[in-house]
Amino acid sequence: MSGKTLYDKLWDAHVVRENPDGSALLYVDRQLLHEVTSPQAFEGLRLAGRRPWRVEANLAVTDHNVPTTNRAQGIADPVSRVQVQTLDRNCEEFGITEYGMLDRRQGIVHVVGPEQGATQPGMTVVCGDSHTSTHGALGALAFGIGTSEVEHALATQTVVQKKAKRMLVRVDGQLGRGVTAKDVVLAIIGRIGTAGGTGYAIEFGGEAIRSLSVEGRMTVCNMSIEAGARCGMVAVDDMTIDYVRGRPFAPKGEHWDQAVAYWKTLHSDPDAEFDQVVVLDAAEIEPQVTWGTSPEMVVPVGGCVPNPFEEQDEVKRSSMGRALDYMGLQPGTPIKEIRLDRVFIGSCTNSRIEDLRAAAEVVRGHKVADSLTQALVVPGSGVVKEQAEKEGLDRVFIEAGFEWREPGCSMCLAMNADRLQSGERCASTSNRNFEGRQGQGGRTHLVNPAMAAAAAIAGHFVDVRHWPE
């Protein structure tokens, strides 16, 4: 009998019952909640006269709808205000810990969970949010669920799931200078496509992945969803354990020692078999820039906007044509000649302290291009913001002409005051470049934080490996 993959180990450890239809009832170790997908779930509990099964297993934050300026004045948009106030009331009524809008620990749920130690290796982690896959970077089985499942998890501490197939994405060798975790995952998506991971749980491995920091691994796992996967994960190593050590929710004393002993088993066995293996050479990965309306529409910064007529597949050719029309681009245009209106550094993909340090290093001593309407930096949490300010990063950004904001999802999605106007073009460190994602008619290009910072200074894309040119 062959060994087990990391996914197998995590799955098997949480199966409560296997169902006749092939699904299984999985125990949930941690549920994370936010204001958008939880109101109906709490109302369902209320109508049924139920209470959460394990109150302490839940943690709530406000992130999607919160303003990133003038918080003392409250939320201007009535719908957003109601959603945030509803989460506040629900958490108070049901006794759930919440980091509300004015709490220093507030931030994007997928930044807050790991930094507070609420996400730990070996856990099942669920949230009513597709990018819950982020938490797999810590060797957890983490995936997004729907609102009805949020209610089910609150009431029973379980969810029903079908087991996914197993994919290993191995990135061999070392990354070159200026190439980041964001470039790795965009290159992976460019290789396998946004449907390449459909039906799979992806384990990311190889020398390049192991050399990434835990925050870098979070960036990779965050976008496993954009590759179509159910979840993404990285095996536990000493770096993982050191990351969790001492955080507020982390085990203490002898419980820590017991946890570490278990966590060290959370890796795929040498003889484990995967349903599919994809291999990339790290040395071939360059800084990436998306040009279209899907994360798979991506090329190296030194490349050009592709020509749909060179695509043999009719469906792909048609979608490329539509994307070019929406993005207002011509085939053959060098990526470096694409001029920008706005730059956004933030989101659950790239708003952690390492991301802000990388961006600040590029920005230091420069000024935002006069041609830009706005350059925005939004820390992923209050904790990240405090650390950045302690290091003086806020001054670097502000002196260069960036806006330094309060934490939240911000311009990643058009659910708050930070959004693009129709026709505006944005270099963004977020994870989705769909039509209208950042605002109706807005045009999004996905890049890493240093690339976004350099683009803000130049007013167009540049190769950060040769910065300043």
From Swiss-Prot:
Example of a GO MF term: 3-isopropylmalate dehydratase activity
Disulfide bond annotation, renumbered to this chain: none
Binding site for [4Fe-4S] cluster: 348, 409, 412
Origin superkingdom: Bacteria
Catalyzed chemical reaction(s): (2R,3S)-3-isopropylmalate = (2S)-2-isopropylmalate
Keyword Lyase recorded: yes
Gene3D superfamilies according to UniProt: Aconitase, domain 3
Cofactor: [4Fe-4S] cluster
Gene Ontology biological process terms, A to Z: L-leucine biosynthetic process
Keyword terms: 4Fe-4S, Amino-acid biosynthesis, Branched-chain amino acid biosynthesis, Iron, Iron-sulfur, Leucine biosynthesis, Lyase, Metal-binding
SUPFAM superfamilies linked: Aconitase iron-sulfur domain
Enzyme Commission designation: 4.2.1.33
Cofactor note: Binds 1 [4Fe-4S] cluster per subunit.
Free-text function comment from the UniProt entry: Catalyzes the isomerization between 2-isopropylmalate and 3-isopropylmalate, via the formation of 2-isopropylmaleate.
Family statement drawn from the similarity comment of this UniProt entry: Belongs to the aconitase/IPM isomerase family. LeuC type 1 subfamily.
NCBIfam families: leuC, PRK05478.1, PRK12466.1
UniProt-listed PANTHER family: 3-ISOPROPYLMALATE DEHYDRATASE, HOMOACONITASE, MITOCHONDRIAL-RELATED
Protein name: 3-isopropylmalate dehydratase large subunit
Species, as recorded: Alkalilimnicola ehrlichii (strain ATCC BAA-1101 / DSM 17681 / MLHE-1)
Name of the gene: leuC
